[in-house]
Regions:
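Secreted/periplasmic carbohydrate-active enzymes, especially glycoside hydrolases
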Residues: 1-72, 81-85, 121-122, 154
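Substrate-binding/catalytic cleft of secreted carbohydrate-active enzymes
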Residues: 50-54, 62-220
């Protein structure tokens, strides 16, 4: 029987993500983990290694696994090669009592199962309000995201949790904003006044605002 371990520290100070107490700029590729012939299942361990090597060769230092809990072999090789991973949960189709129950149980199982992989540096339970479509104003959905945040932190207080990646944040350790604008000039103009976006004075993406109603930006 063989095993391994890795040591690293992820922290946030003064608006910056630190790796081992040093500012670290994350160049992450959004990776949906599809394979040509086997779909969501990696065809082989060699294919996983080749995928990670290509990611590194293109200049990325990490991946945001999108809507997929990845094979443990992928996480192992990211541990070995020093590639960072944002671990994101697949979204429920809609918000209801059954979805809340199943999502909570499955998400906590995932956090506990993958807790010891040093490559994972951020937990992302929700993405772009998928499965919580009315979280911007619906108090029940907001409370659900708060509960998931605190349950995650109770298991793992050491990693950042981005509760709703992209927009309409409730409680979150990092304010992440998704923007699909293709014009650099428009992009520059839009983000010239950061305070207008973080205060919900203007939306950054169509009708999507940075914060959900009733929540304020705290510098995260």
């Amino acid at each position: 029987v063989h095993s391994y371990f890795g040591l690293r520290k992820i922290s946030i100070q003064k608006g910056k993500v630190l790796l081992n107490n040093e500012p670290f700029y994350q160049r992450l590729i959004l990776d949906q983990g599809y394979w040509t012939d086997s779909h969501l299942t990696p065809p082989s361990e060699e294919a996983i290694i080749e995928d990670i090597d290509k990611i590194m060769a293109m200049g990325y230092n990490g991946v945001r696994k999108h809507q997929k809990i990845e094979d443990a072999r992928f996480l192992y090789w990211c541990d070995v090669k020093g590639v960072l991973v944002w671990s994101e949960m697949a979204a429920a189709y809609e918000f209801n009592d059954q979805a809340v129950d199943r999502f909570t149980r499955e998400w906590l199982d995932i956090v506990q199962q993958h807790y010891n992989h040093p490559c994972i540096v951020t937990w992302v339970p929700f993405n772009e309000s998928w499965g919580i479509a009315n979280v911007f104003a619906d108090r029940k959905q907001q409370q659900f995201t708060e509960a998931i945040y605190h349950l995650t932190k109770s298991i793992d207080p050491y990693r950042p949790v981005v509760v709703n990646d992209g927009w309409e944040h409730t409680v979150s350790d990092i304010l992440t904003l998704h923007d699909y604008e293709e014009s650099g000039a428009k992009f520059l103009k839009r983000y010239a006044d950061k305070d207008a976006i973080t205060s919900n004075e203007i939306s950054h993406m169509n009708a999507r605002y940075a914060m959900a109603q009733g929540y304020a930006y705290r510098g995260q």
